[in-house]
Amino acid sequence: GLDFGAKTVGVAITDASGTLAQRKEIIRRQRENALRKTYARIQELIQEYEISCIVLGLPLHLDGSVSERANKTLLFQVELERRTGLQVIMQDERLTSVEAEDLMREAGIPKSDWKAQIDMIAAELILQDYLNHRDRYQ
């Protein structure tokens, strides 16, 4: 599962049974469009964990309309499919950042550490939502 942001990509993977999402890492980049190393790291993760498809969060507005970030995410999806040869499934990610903040607050994580973890937690939530409802994609 991926949470594609302006300068980061949060990454989550599933457990061996494919039922539980686990946060993995955050891929950082210096500039928004500097994606070469991001694609390379995703390729490494695909090989390391034998990933067969990718779930990518789609940041729609609350009313369901497409945001500027969603347009950039859709372009990222196309390029990711081209580079990896894998299907990239788009998953609605509305309110995942709010949910991630709630989880960090409940876990007692200091606010100063939130920025370092929010994208990875959001990726985990995106992937878990897909896993919980994957029958609607088949």
Predicted stretch roles:
Residues 7-138:
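Phosphate- and other anionic-substrate recognition elements at nucleic-acid/protein interfaces
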Residues 1-3:
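Short glycine-aspartate micro-motif
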